[in-house]
A protein has these predicted regions:
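Interfacial juxtamembrane loops and adjacent helix segments
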Residues: 20-83
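Membrane-helix interface segments
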Residues: 103-109, 153-160
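Short acidic/glycine- and proline-prone juxtamembrane loop motifs at membrane-interface regions
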Residues: 1, 126-134
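Membrane-interface transmembrane helices that cradle and orient dolichyl/undecaprenyl
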Residues: 141-159
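Transmembrane-helix motifs of polytopic, lipid-linked glycan transferases
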Residues: 82-102, 140-144
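Short helix- or helix-capping micro-motifs
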Residues: 111-116, 123, 143, 167, ...
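Transmembrane-embedded, aromatic-rich helix segments that form part
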Residues: 162, 176-190
Length: 190
């Protein structure tokens, strides 16, 4: 389970502003997932432990945070998962809108059902990790770009602004979303 790493990383960044634990992923989704933990001011981060100072000590830091320094582990994990569940619901709604835009309501409802019942989304749509946030913002960026390309006669900065914001959210979610830049470029040429 690497969930404790994401939770500890997000809370450490939110409380200290120090990105030292965010070596693998940008802090956006990790920080978003721990926002409900602000309702628990008694939570302690092990910043007094040597693992805070060591670059390779972040696994130990996360284990200490979740299993030793704090005692309400179930509540910490539950609250950290809530924002990811909402991102999963948002992904379903974007999938619905995508299908509705291209094929109408007859396709949108089954698309929503298939998306929300898809085993990978059901499995990962509740974990406090960066996967769902990256999926949501990458899919939303692709959808917005596709709509822009379909109606290229109305290219205006106001129509590009939401695309740029959502693309920035995708890049802020997970580093692997940068791999979609060439895909989006190829789609633009089609």
């Amino acid at each position: 389970m690497d969930e404790q790493n994401h939770i500890a990383r997000g809370l450490a960044f939110l409380r200290t502003g120090d990105p030292r634990l965010s070596l693998e992923h940008p802090p956006l989704i990790n920080t978003l997932s721990v926002l409900p933990l602000l309702t628990m001011p008694e939570l302690r981060l092990p910043t007094d432990h040597p693992s805070w100072e060591r670059r390779e000590g972040w696994y130990e830091f996360a284990d200490l945070f979740l299993w030793q320094y704090n005692h309400d582990t179930a509540r910490i994990v539950f609250l950290s998962r809530l924002p990811i569940v909402f991102l999963t619901i948002a992904l379903g709604l974007v999938g619905y809108r995508f299908a509705f835009h291209f094929w109408g309501r007859a396709a949108a409802v089954p698309a929503l059902a298939l998306l929300l019942l898809e085993p990978n989304l059901m499995a990962h749509g509740r974990y406090a990790t960066t996967d769902l946030g990256a999926t949501l913002f990458t899919f939303l960026t692709t959808f917005l770009l596709w709509r822009l390309w379909l109606d290229s006669s109305r290219w205006h900065w106001r129509r590009w602004l939401p695309v740029a914001v959502v693309m920035g959210l995708a890049f802020g979610s997970k580093l692997s979303t940068l791999g979609f830049v060439p895909i989006w470029a190829v789609l633009a040429l089609l």
